[in-house]
Amino acid sequence: MENIGIDVKKPERTCNDPKCPFHGNLRIHGQIIVGTVVSTKMNGSIVLKRESRRLIKKYERYETKISKFHAHLPGCIDVRPGDRVKIAECRKLAKTISFVVVEKVN
């Protein structure tokens, strides 16, 4: 499958993963999130961290909020902890996984 519906580079490697949006039959829709990989210890999945800052006017300070997402990692994309990646929403793949990694961002 060539076009997955968003503007990302197709991975150079191929895989036989049916849950891959590029080489399998997984459709993506909804949110697209960019964040930092925290952990790759799960088999075929990653934990992603997204930080956002907001101003608290009363104290004239910024507050940092951290959100963690679990995402499926296809075999054709190689990531390590600390890398920035783009994930896209898909159908629920496991109890806590409803996103899939689509691109490694520099």
UniProtKB/Swiss-Prot annotation:
Against SUPFAM superfamilies, the record matches this protein to: Nucleic acid-binding proteins
The record's InterPro entries line, in alphabetical order, gives:
NA-bd_OB-fold, Ribosomal_uS17, Ribosomal_uS17_arc/euk, Ribosomal_uS17_archaeal
Q: What Gene3D superfamilies does its record include?
A: 2.40.50.1000
Any single GO BP term: translation
Keyword Ribonucleoprotein listed? The answer is yes
Sorted alphabetically, the keyword list is:
Ribonucleoprotein, Ribosomal protein, RNA-binding, rRNA-binding
Database matches in Pfam families: Ribosomal_S17
Keyword match DNA-binding: no
Single annotated GO MF: structural constituent of ribosome
Cellular component GO terms, alphabetically?
cytosolic small ribosomal subunit
Q: Any idea what job this protein has?
A: One of the primary rRNA binding proteins, it binds specifically to the 5'-end of 16S ribosomal RNA.
| Similarity section | Belongs to the universal ribosomal protein uS17 family.
Question: Subunit comment for this entry?
Answer: Part of the 30S ribosomal subunit.
Identify this protein by name.
Small ribosomal subunit protein uS17
**Organism per entry:** Picrophilus torridus (strain ATCC 700027 / DSM 9790 / JCM 10055 / NBRC 100828 / KAW 2/3)
What is the gene name?
A: rps17
